[in-house]
Protein backbone atom coordinates (compact mmCIF):
# COMPACT_ATOMS: atom_id res chain seq x y z
CA UNK A 1 0.00 0.00 0.00
CA UNK A 2 0.91 3.65 -0.39
CA UNK A 3 -0.18 5.32 2.83
CA UNK A 4 -0.24 9.03 3.59
CA UNK A 5 0.20 9.73 7.31
CA UNK A 6 -1.00 13.23 8.15
CA UNK A 7 0.84 14.43 11.24
CA UNK A 8 3.50 11.82 10.58
CA UNK A 9 6.14 13.70 12.57
CA UNK A 10 4.06 13.81 15.76
CA UNK A 11 3.97 11.56 18.82
CA UNK A 12 1.43 9.17 17.28
CA UNK A 13 2.20 9.70 13.61
CA UNK A 14 5.87 8.71 13.93
CA UNK A 15 4.90 5.38 15.47
CA UNK A 16 2.28 4.70 12.80
CA UNK A 17 4.67 5.57 9.97
CA UNK A 18 7.44 3.40 11.42
CA UNK A 19 5.10 0.42 11.88
CA UNK A 20 3.78 0.72 8.32
CA UNK A 21 7.26 0.97 6.86
CA UNK A 22 8.43 -2.04 8.88
CA UNK A 23 5.62 -4.01 7.22
CA UNK A 24 6.87 -3.06 3.77
CA UNK A 25 4.40 -0.32 2.86
CA UNK A 26 5.31 2.91 1.08
CA UNK A 27 4.84 5.74 3.56
CA UNK A 28 4.23 9.38 2.69
CA UNK A 29 4.23 11.93 5.47
CA UNK A 30 2.07 15.05 5.59
CA UNK A 31 3.60 17.89 7.59
CA UNK A 32 3.24 21.66 7.95
CA UNK A 33 6.97 22.13 7.27
CA UNK A 34 8.46 19.22 5.27
CA UNK A 35 12.11 20.33 5.42
CA UNK A 36 12.07 20.91 9.15
CA UNK A 37 10.09 17.70 9.58
CA UNK A 38 12.72 15.64 7.78
CA UNK A 39 15.34 16.72 10.30
CA UNK A 40 13.04 15.68 13.16
CA UNK A 41 12.24 12.25 11.78
CA UNK A 42 14.09 9.15 13.00
CA UNK A 43 16.67 7.86 10.48
CA UNK A 44 14.41 5.00 9.36
CA UNK A 45 11.80 7.49 8.09
CA UNK A 46 13.99 10.15 6.49
CA UNK A 47 13.69 8.62 3.03
CA UNK A 48 9.88 8.90 3.10
CA UNK A 49 8.23 11.31 0.70
CA UNK A 50 7.05 14.42 2.53
CA UNK A 51 4.08 16.54 1.46
CA UNK A 52 3.11 19.92 2.85
CA UNK A 53 -0.23 19.90 4.65
CA UNK A 54 -1.92 22.72 6.59
CA UNK A 55 -5.25 21.30 7.72
CA UNK A 56 -6.69 24.70 8.58
CA UNK A 57 -6.48 25.50 4.84
CA UNK A 58 -7.90 22.17 3.64
CA UNK A 59 -11.56 22.70 4.47
CA UNK A 60 -13.10 21.90 1.08
CA UNK A 61 -12.98 18.64 -0.86
CA UNK A 62 -11.08 19.98 -3.87
CA UNK A 63 -8.22 21.25 -1.71
CA UNK A 64 -7.29 17.66 -0.85
CA UNK A 65 -6.99 16.08 -4.30
CA UNK A 66 -3.36 17.00 -5.05
CA UNK A 67 -2.23 16.01 -1.56
CA UNK A 68 -3.89 12.59 -1.82
CA UNK A 69 -2.61 11.77 -5.32
CA UNK A 70 -1.10 8.30 -5.55
CA UNK A 71 -2.25 7.17 -2.10
CA UNK A 72 -4.41 4.14 -1.30
CA UNK A 73 -5.03 4.94 2.36
CA UNK A 74 -4.92 8.13 4.42
CA UNK A 75 -4.27 8.20 8.15
CA UNK A 76 -5.20 11.41 9.96
CA UNK A 77 -3.11 11.75 13.11
CA UNK A 78 -3.46 15.54 13.30
CA UNK A 79 -4.96 17.25 16.30
CA UNK A 80 -4.41 20.45 18.25
CA UNK A 81 -4.52 20.87 22.00
CA UNK A 82 -5.23 24.59 21.78
CA UNK A 83 -6.27 27.05 19.11
CA UNK A 84 -3.64 29.31 17.60
CA UNK A 85 -4.45 31.88 14.91
CA UNK A 86 -6.11 30.18 11.93
CA UNK A 87 -5.68 26.77 13.56
CA UNK A 88 -9.07 26.51 15.24
CA UNK A 89 -10.77 23.45 16.69
CA UNK A 90 -13.53 23.73 14.13
CA UNK A 91 -11.16 23.82 11.16
CA UNK A 92 -8.64 21.20 12.30
CA UNK A 93 -10.92 18.73 14.10
CA UNK A 94 -14.16 19.17 12.14
CA UNK A 95 -14.08 20.97 8.80
CA UNK A 96 -10.77 19.60 7.49
CA UNK A 97 -11.61 15.94 8.36
CA UNK A 98 -15.06 16.46 6.80
CA UNK A 99 -13.46 17.64 3.55
CA UNK A 100 -10.85 14.88 3.72
CA UNK A 101 -13.55 12.23 4.09
CA UNK A 102 -15.42 13.69 1.10
CA UNK A 103 -12.22 13.56 -0.96
CA UNK A 104 -11.61 9.95 0.10
CA UNK A 105 -15.18 9.02 -0.84
CA UNK A 106 -14.73 10.69 -4.23
CA UNK A 107 -11.43 8.92 -4.90
CA UNK A 108 -12.27 5.56 -3.34
CA UNK A 109 -9.54 5.87 -0.70
CA UNK A 110 -9.73 4.50 2.79
CA UNK A 111 -9.55 6.92 5.71
CA UNK A 112 -8.24 5.99 9.15
CA UNK A 113 -8.99 8.84 11.54
CA UNK A 114 -7.40 8.93 15.00
CA UNK A 115 -9.76 10.45 17.55
CA UNK A 116 -10.13 9.85 21.29
CA UNK A 117 -12.19 7.93 23.82
CA UNK A 118 -14.76 9.73 25.92
CA UNK A 119 -16.25 12.23 23.45
CA UNK A 120 -19.77 13.37 24.39
CA UNK A 121 -22.29 15.54 22.60
CA UNK A 122 -22.95 17.82 25.55
CA UNK A 123 -19.35 18.30 26.69
CA UNK A 124 -18.55 21.88 27.64
CA UNK A 125 -15.23 21.86 25.80
CA UNK A 126 -14.89 22.91 22.15
CA UNK A 127 -11.79 20.70 22.02
CA UNK A 128 -14.03 17.67 22.61
CA UNK A 129 -17.16 18.69 20.71
CA UNK A 130 -15.15 19.55 17.59
CA UNK A 131 -13.61 16.08 17.62
CA UNK A 132 -17.05 14.50 17.92
CA UNK A 133 -18.35 16.63 15.04
CA UNK A 134 -15.43 15.42 12.92
CA UNK A 135 -16.21 11.79 13.75
CA UNK A 136 -19.85 12.19 12.79
CA UNK A 137 -19.02 13.88 9.49
CA UNK A 138 -16.62 11.08 8.56
CA UNK A 139 -19.22 8.44 9.40
CA UNK A 140 -21.75 10.18 7.11
CA UNK A 141 -19.31 10.79 4.24
CA UNK A 142 -19.67 7.53 2.33
CA UNK A 143 -15.90 6.94 2.44
CA UNK A 144 -14.50 3.60 3.62
CA UNK A 145 -13.35 4.64 7.09
CA UNK A 146 -12.12 3.57 10.49
CA UNK A 147 -12.31 5.87 13.50
CA UNK A 148 -9.68 4.87 16.05
CA UNK A 149 -10.18 5.92 19.67
CA UNK A 150 -7.14 5.28 21.88
CA UNK A 151 -6.96 5.84 25.62
CA UNK A 152 -4.10 7.64 27.41
CA UNK A 153 -0.78 7.03 25.66
CA UNK A 154 2.53 6.29 27.35
CA UNK A 155 5.87 6.55 25.57
CA UNK A 156 8.89 8.67 24.79
CA UNK A 157 8.46 11.84 22.77
CA UNK A 158 4.95 12.81 23.84
CA UNK A 159 4.37 16.22 25.41
CA UNK A 160 1.56 15.02 27.65
CA UNK A 161 3.27 11.74 28.57
CA UNK A 162 6.49 13.58 29.46
CA UNK A 163 4.56 16.09 31.56
CA UNK A 164 2.79 13.32 33.51
CA UNK A 165 6.10 11.55 34.16
CA UNK A 166 7.48 14.82 35.50
CA UNK A 167 4.47 15.31 37.77
CA UNK A 168 4.79 11.76 39.04
CA UNK A 169 8.31 12.48 40.34
CA UNK A 170 7.03 15.17 42.68
CA UNK A 171 6.69 14.18 46.36
CA UNK A 172 3.21 15.77 46.34
CA UNK A 173 0.60 14.86 43.73
CA UNK A 174 -2.05 17.52 43.10
CA UNK A 175 -4.99 15.64 41.59
CA UNK A 176 -8.36 17.19 40.67
CA UNK A 177 -10.98 15.92 43.10
CA UNK A 178 -13.35 15.10 40.23
CA UNK A 179 -10.70 13.10 38.30
CA UNK A 180 -12.30 9.80 39.28
CA UNK A 181 -12.45 8.24 35.83
CA UNK A 182 -10.30 5.28 34.89
CA UNK A 183 -7.90 5.42 31.97
CA UNK A 184 -6.74 2.33 30.06
CA UNK A 185 -3.13 3.43 29.69
CA UNK A 186 -1.44 1.96 26.61
CA UNK A 187 1.96 2.14 24.93
CA UNK A 188 2.12 4.45 21.91
CA UNK A 189 4.20 1.80 20.12
CA UNK A 190 1.25 -0.59 20.44
CA UNK A 191 -1.00 2.06 18.92
CA UNK A 192 1.32 2.39 15.93
CA UNK A 193 1.37 -1.36 15.37
CA UNK A 194 -2.39 -1.66 15.78
CA UNK A 195 -3.12 1.04 13.20
CA UNK A 196 -0.69 -0.55 10.73
CA UNK A 197 -2.46 -3.88 11.23
CA UNK A 198 -5.84 -2.19 10.83
CA UNK A 199 -4.78 -0.74 7.47
CA UNK A 200 -4.05 -4.27 6.25
CA UNK A 201 -7.56 -5.47 7.08
CA UNK A 202 -10.42 -5.01 4.67
CA UNK A 203 -12.53 -1.96 5.37
CA UNK A 204 -15.83 -3.19 6.80
CA UNK A 205 -18.52 -2.26 9.30
CA UNK A 206 -16.64 -4.35 11.87
CA UNK A 207 -13.73 -1.90 11.80
CA UNK A 208 -15.60 1.41 11.48
CA UNK A 209 -15.19 2.22 15.17
CA UNK A 210 -12.09 0.86 16.89
CA UNK A 211 -11.50 1.45 20.61
CA UNK A 212 -8.05 0.73 21.99
CA UNK A 213 -6.46 0.64 25.44
CA UNK A 214 -4.26 -1.30 27.79
CA UNK A 215 -5.44 -4.14 29.97
CA UNK A 216 -5.33 -2.12 33.21
CA UNK A 217 -7.38 0.95 34.05
CA UNK A 218 -5.98 3.12 36.85
CA UNK A 219 -7.34 6.45 37.95
CA UNK A 220 -5.05 9.42 37.44
CA UNK A 221 -4.00 9.28 41.10
CA UNK A 222 -3.18 5.56 40.84
CA UNK A 223 -1.25 6.14 37.63
CA UNK A 224 0.89 8.91 39.14
CA UNK A 225 1.57 6.86 42.27
CA UNK A 226 2.66 3.84 40.25
CA UNK A 227 4.80 5.97 37.93
CA UNK A 228 6.62 7.42 40.95
CA UNK A 229 7.32 3.95 42.34
CA UNK A 230 7.15 5.11 45.95
CA UNK A 231 4.58 6.86 48.13
CA UNK A 232 3.62 10.48 47.54
CA UNK A 233 1.32 12.85 49.39
CA UNK A 234 -1.92 13.25 47.45
CA UNK A 235 -3.73 16.58 47.56
CA UNK A 236 -7.25 16.65 46.13
CA UNK A 237 -7.73 19.91 44.20
CA UNK A 238 -11.30 21.24 44.61
CA UNK A 239 -13.50 21.31 41.54
CA UNK A 240 -13.65 25.09 41.27
CA UNK A 241 -9.88 25.48 41.56
CA UNK A 242 -9.09 22.68 39.09
CA UNK A 243 -11.45 24.25 36.56
CA UNK A 244 -9.97 27.71 37.08
CA UNK A 245 -6.43 26.38 36.62
CA UNK A 246 -7.44 24.44 33.49
CA UNK A 247 -8.93 27.57 31.91
CA UNK A 248 -5.85 29.62 32.84
CA UNK A 249 -3.61 26.97 31.27
CA UNK A 250 -5.72 27.18 28.12
CA UNK A 251 -5.47 30.97 28.02
CA UNK A 252 -1.71 30.98 28.63
CA UNK A 253 -1.01 27.91 26.46
CA UNK A 254 0.77 26.50 29.50
CA UNK A 255 1.26 22.74 30.02
CA UNK A 256 -0.86 19.95 28.48
CA UNK A 257 -3.45 20.36 31.26
CA UNK A 258 -6.59 21.78 29.68
CA UNK A 259 -10.29 22.07 30.42
CA UNK A 260 -10.96 19.42 27.78
CA UNK A 261 -8.70 16.94 29.53
CA UNK A 262 -10.25 17.78 32.89
CA UNK A 263 -13.64 16.94 31.40
CA UNK A 264 -12.30 13.59 30.15
CA UNK A 265 -10.85 12.72 33.57
CA UNK A 266 -14.27 13.00 35.21
CA UNK A 267 -15.48 9.77 33.55
CA UNK A 268 -14.06 6.38 32.67
CA UNK A 269 -12.23 6.38 29.35
CA UNK A 270 -11.78 2.71 28.63
CA UNK A 271 -12.37 0.74 25.42
CA UNK A 272 -15.48 -1.40 25.13
CA UNK A 273 -14.71 -3.72 23.51
CA UNK A 274 -10.93 -3.43 23.41
CA UNK A 275 -9.74 -4.25 19.89
CA UNK A 276 -6.05 -3.89 20.74
CA UNK A 277 -5.22 -7.55 21.53
CA UNK A 278 -7.01 -8.69 18.39
CA UNK A 279 -5.17 -6.26 16.13
CA UNK A 280 -1.79 -6.99 17.71
CA UNK A 281 -2.28 -10.75 17.88
CA UNK A 282 -0.95 -10.62 21.45
CA UNK A 283 -1.57 -8.96 24.78
CA UNK A 284 -0.75 -5.24 24.94
CA UNK A 285 2.58 -4.21 26.42
CA UNK A 286 2.46 -3.69 30.17
CA UNK A 287 2.85 -0.09 31.29
CA UNK A 288 5.65 -0.30 33.84
CA UNK A 289 6.35 2.40 36.37
CA UNK A 290 9.79 3.77 37.26
CA UNK A 291 9.77 1.72 40.41
CA UNK A 292 9.02 -1.48 38.49
CA UNK A 293 5.36 -1.72 39.46
CA UNK A 294 3.03 -3.03 36.78
CA UNK A 295 -0.60 -1.99 36.95
CA UNK A 296 -2.76 -4.93 37.98
CA UNK A 297 -6.29 -3.65 38.45
CA UNK A 298 -9.59 -5.53 38.33
CA UNK A 299 -10.88 -6.32 34.86
CA UNK A 300 -14.27 -5.00 35.98
CA UNK A 301 -12.80 -1.51 35.55
CA UNK A 302 -12.91 -1.99 31.78
CA UNK A 303 -16.51 -0.96 31.28
CA UNK A 304 -18.34 1.44 29.02
CA UNK A 305 -18.11 4.97 30.48
CA UNK A 306 -21.41 6.40 31.64
CA UNK A 307 -22.83 9.23 29.53
Regions found by a protein language model. Give the residues of each.
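SDR active-site strand-loop-helix element
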Residues: 6, 30, 77-78, 111-116, ...
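Mid/C-terminal beta-alpha module of Rossmann-like enzyme folds, strongest
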Residues: 198-257, 271-307
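NAD(P)H-binding glycine-rich loop region in Rossmannoid oxidoreductase-like domains
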Residues: 35, 44-98, 103-105, 117-121
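N-terminal Rossmann NAD(P)H-binding glycine-rich loop of SDR-like oxidoreductase domains
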Residues: 3-25
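Conserved beta-loop-beta element that borders a ligand/cofactor-binding pocket
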Residues: 115, 136-157, 166
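Alpha-helical membrane-targeting segments
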Residues: 162-188, 231-271
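Substrate-positioning beta->alpha
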Residues: 159-160, 177-200, 207-211
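Residues forming the Rossmann-fold NAD(P)(H) cofactor-binding site
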Residues: 13-15, 94, 132
Amino acid sequence: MRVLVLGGTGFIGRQVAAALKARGHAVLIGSRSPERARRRLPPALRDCELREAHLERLTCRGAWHALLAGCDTVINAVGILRERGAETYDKVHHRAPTALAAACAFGGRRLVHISALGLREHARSAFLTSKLAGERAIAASGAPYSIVRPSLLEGEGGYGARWLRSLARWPVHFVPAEARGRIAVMAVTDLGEAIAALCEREASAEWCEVELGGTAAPTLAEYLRARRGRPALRVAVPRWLARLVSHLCDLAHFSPFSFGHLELLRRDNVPCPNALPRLLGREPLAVVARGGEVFDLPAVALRRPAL
